[in-house]
From Swiss-Prot:
Residues 1-19 form the signal peptide. This is Putative DD-carboxypeptidase TP_0574. A recombinant non-lipidated form (residues 20-434) is recognized by human antisera, indicating the lipidation site is not essential for antigenicity, although the acylated lipopeptide clearly is antigenic. The non-lipidated form also binds penicillin. A lipid is attached at residue 20 (N-palmitoyl cysteine). Its cofactor is Zn(2+). Its EC number is 3.4.-.-. Pfam families: PBP-Tp47_a, PBP-Tp47_c. The keyword Signal applies. A lipid is attached at residue 20 (S-diacylglycerol cysteine). Keywords: Cell inner membrane, Cell membrane, Hydrolase, Lipoprotein, Membrane, Palmitate, Protease, Signal. It is found in: Cell inner membrane.
Length: 434
């Protein structure tokens, strides 16, 4: 490409481009909106058609399987479209509200009960841009043009002065995937993937994908370039028997790269740029040498964050899901991916399920454990709590037989007792205190 400069009357220089033929070799950088299938196809070396393939079997809620990264998800709805609307391509379906009444839930929180007209529905795009964090930790945001913005815990939305109760939420993919687009594919990228050029994206951007054809992208490029706000893992905890259906979960606590504590503002900045998590499975290989399989995940169904002041990303796995085929207990390397940050890598071991019987009783301060053998209970510990309440007992060592705990239990009250083994996943039981 040749360039010439022309002197304008005001004394400024005007850049003239001569010989446009070479522009076809130009690469454009910016952000694209990719479905989960489009994103993970390049990462996993699979065709997007395979990732999108579904079957005619309905799940327990009556929804049809529409592929490994099915947009229909009760977990998606449960974790809140408010948090998803910043980084993800979200659609919300609602029924027209005829009347509503304010009530309280079991925890005393205010909620609305609606009378709706199911024959009048509205599907809208939910999209918001993060603006600031208030002194009280409240996330301040604005609606993106042509979309609705949902408040935290929103149960409805407004369109043209009409209110609609939210009945379903679909998360189709990620809105801001950094991509490199060849000049000849730029038009298709804009039309199919909502590509927008952005000067913040360069050839050195961490996570950069290259558009290869009109419907495929390369694996992401991993950059070693440091950033002053990079994060690392602080601690990783594990849990089992999630109420959201996970077989196992990792709680990844974050801190600054220099080892200092992460502020709430810094954590919110991170999650507002958070995209996804990659799971690499090593089976029983504690050295993380022999990779058995890699899995793509879907935010809200497999990973999530909360608006509280704990800098934590939760990562769950359900061994029976199509996208986790061949997975099971063992060693995993989790890679947390966020725009503008180097990858955060967390190693975790998910323990096998305890298949034996265990009997639990509560009376006064005494917890009685029976059924399991003494060896299984070696180095075991318990947590005890009532629904919606802080833990009464946390991480107290127990053994077979009677154990005197550090709290009194109210007779007739139901408690959750979680027994955590050394070599098995934890066991939970609902127990009414005597």
């Amino acid at each position: 490409m040749k360039v010439k400069y022309a002197l304008l009357s005001a004394g400024a220089l005007q850049l003239l481009v001569v010989g446009c033929g070479s522009s076809h070799h130009e690469t454009h950088y910016g952000y694209a909106t990719l479905s989960y299938a489009d994103y993970w196809a390049g990462e996993l070396g699979q065709s997007r058609d395979v990732l999108l393939a579904g079957n005619a079997e309905a799940d327990r809620a009556g929804d049809l399987d529409a592929g490994m990264f099915d947009a229909v998800s009760r977990a998606t709805h449960g974790h809140g479209a408010f948090r998803q609307q910043f980084q993800y391509a979200v659609e919300v379906l609602g029924e027209k509200v005829l009347s509503k009444q304010e009530t309280e839930d079991s925890r005393g929180r205010k909620k609305w009960e609606y009378e709706t007209d199911p024959s009048v529905t509205k599907m809208v795009r939910a999209s918001a841009s993060f603006q600031d964090l208030g002194e009280d930790g409240e996330i301040k945001f604005e609606a993106v043009e042509g979309a609705v913005a949902l408040a935290d815990r929103a149960s409805s939305f407004m369109v043209d002065s009409e209110e609609y109760k939210i009945t379903n939420v679909k998360v189709h993919g990620m809105k801001f995937v950094p991509v490199a687009v060849p000049h000849e594919l730029k038009g298709i990228a804009k039309e199919k993937f909502h590509f927008v050029e952005d000067s913040r994206v360069t050839e050195n951007t961490n996570g950069l994908k290259t558009m290869l054809t009109e419907d495929s992208f390369s694996a992401r490029k991993v950059s070693s370039m440091e950033s002053p706000h990079d994060l690392v893992v602080d601690t990783v905890g594990t849990g089992y028997h999630s109420r959201f259906g996970s077989d196992a979960e990792a709680s990844v606590m974050l801190k600054r790269a220099d080892g200092s504590e992460l502020s709430h503002r810094e954590f919110i900045d991170y999650v507002m740029n958070f995209n996804t998590v990659r799971y690499d499975y090593y089976g029983d290989d504690a050295s993380y040498t022999n990779l058995m399989a890699s899995y793509g995940t879907k935010h809200s169904a497999d990973s999530w964050w909360k608006t509280g002041r704990v800098p934590r990303i939760s990562c769950g796995i359900n061994y029976g899901f199509d996208r986790f085929k061949g997975s099971g207990p063992g060693y995993y390397r989790l890679t947390l991916i966020a725009n503008g940050y180097r990858d955060v890598v967390a190693d975790v071991r998910f323990l096998p399920k305890y298949e034996g019987n265990i009997d639990i009783g509560l009376k006064g301060k005494v917890l009685t454990i029976g059924g399991a053998d003494a060896e299984t209970l070696m180095d075991a510990a318990v947590d005890v709590f009532a629904d919606g309440q802080p833990k009464l007992v946390s991480d107290q060592a127990v053994s077979l037989g009677q154990n005197v705990l550090s709290a009194d239990f109210t007779p007739g009250t139901e408690y959750t007792v979680e027994v955590r083994f050394k070599e098995f996943g934890s066991v939970r039981a609902k127990v009414v205190a005597q």
